[in-house]
Amino acid sequence: MRKFLAGMMCFVLLLASAACSSNTETKNPNLSDVIGEIRAAIEFPEMAEIKVADLPMYGYDLKPEDVAEMQFITAGSGFTADEVVLIKLNDKSKAEEVKKMAEIRRDGIAETAQNYTPDEMEKLTTAVVGVKDSYVYYAATNDNAKAKEILTNAF
């Protein structure tokens, strides 16, 4: 009987310690690697790289000191909706606000595309927008499902 009780106590302690353990892993991906993986997996037209100082021109009300790291590529021609934005913020409390900026940008592009390039609308209606800790990401590509898979694994 004592062995049974001792075994049960060990089992209960094991369950309690498993319940208290944290399964949330904090990832710290290199954004250059993430954008490289996306570019390797998905076909893009000619893309232009955007610098942090130019973010306000693209609807992101951020100062360079707000951004710890960034990768931003957009269609060089402006005729397609292809765009990938990866931002690591210095202050993660701003992440939801920056996500909203990405959604507003997507909606603005969609409004224009609806009239001029309606075939680009699917990229925008299925675009990936998300936040994970201090990271914000937005992707409108030819394969948003693949972009989402890569981004989910990265963050």
Predicted regions and their residues:
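Short, compositionally biased low-complexity segments enriched in polar/charged residues
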Residues: 49-79, 93, 97
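C-terminal motif of bacterial Sec signal peptides marking the signal peptidase cleavage site
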Residues: 15-19
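A short, solvent-exposed beta-edge/loop patch
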Residues: 119-155
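Positively charged n-region of N-terminal signal peptides that target proteins for export
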Residues: 1-4, 8
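A short acidic-to-branched-hydrophobic micro-motif
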Residues: 81-91
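Short amphipathic alpha-helices in soluble, non-transmembrane regions
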Residues: 98-105, 150-155
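Bacterial signal peptide processing site
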Residues: 21-24
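An anionic, turn-rich surface loop/hairpin at beta-sheet edges
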Residues: 104-127
